[in-house]
A protein has these predicted regions:
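A generic structural signal for short beta-strands and their flanking turns/coil linkers
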Residues: 91-93, 110-112, 131
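Short, conserved beta-strand element in jelly-roll/cupin
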Residues: 113-119, 126-142
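A short, N-terminal "cap"/entry segment at the start of jelly-roll beta-barrel domains
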Residues: 2-107
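Short beta-turn/strand-loop junction motif enriched in small, turn-promoting residues
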Residues: 100-102, 120-121, 164-166
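Short acidic-glycine-tyrosine-enriched beta hairpin
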Residues: 146-165
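Double-stranded beta-helix
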Residues: 5-9, 171-197
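Short histidine-centered beta-strand/loop micro-motifs
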Residues: 105-106, 122-127, 144, 169
Length: 197
């Protein structure tokens, strides 16, 4: 099942290399290796595959490549076993392209897709890794501690520094984002406050 992954990797590479902010933050890796992993399905995979609100002007190819590969992905459940409820676990979508439980590995980067349906809240959380979001389709409000809220749509960029608490929320539109990490890959995100709902 190489074909959807190879197409997705090449499409992500093209988008990443063309975006100076992404390249400055974390250059697209040159040490990529294939790796074996087991697919793992969650309901968010079906939601993303059937989503009709992921509108984009510039990133349709990458959006579609993430959707095409999603039936074969290992969907993450980062917050399982926390105070996060079933709604979040069933509707928040994230799977890896580069990193653990992903089709490719690199020593310098982690890369995922994140999907959230409309009217969805991703609670405040933080992690040692530095992070950058590129909004591919739809829109969301991004919040960072001690910063004004920012509503971003397709093409918008958001950077989170190490251990900076941040959250996201969608309203009338869903969102899909290409997300990369640099440095400090070993620690998973943790909830900052007990505000999950």
């Amino acid at each position: 099942m190489d074909h959807p992954w190879e197409k997705l990797l090449e499409t992500a590479r093209k988008v990443h290399l063309a975006n100076s902010k992404l390249q400055d933050f974390c250059p697209f890796p040159t040490d990529i290796k294939k790796q074996k992993f087991d697919a793992f399905h969650i309901p968010a995979s079906d939601l993303m595959q059937n989503e009709t609100g992921l509108l984009t002007d510039d990133y349709a190819e990458l959006r579609d490549a993430f959707i095409s590969a999603s039936p074969y992905a290992h969907w993450r459940q980062t917050y399982k076993g926390t105070i996060i409820g079933e709604k979040f676990l069933n509707e928040f979508g994230c799977y890896g392209l580069i990193g653990p439980e992903s089709p490719f590995q690199s020593e310098t980067i982690r890369a995922w897709v994140v999907y959230m349906p409309k009217n969805f809240y991703y609670p405040w959380h933080h992690h040692p890794a530095e992070e950058m979001y590129l909004c591919l389709a739809g829109e969301a409000v991004f919040r960072r501690e001690n910063c004004p809220d920012i509503r971003l749509g397709s093409g918008g960029i958001m950077e989170h520094s190490a251990n900076q608490p941040h959250s996201m929320e969608t309203f009338e539109h869903p969102i899909m984002a290409y997300v990369v990490w640099r440095n400090e890959f070993g620690t998973k995100p943790v909830l900052t406050f007990e505000d999950a709902r």
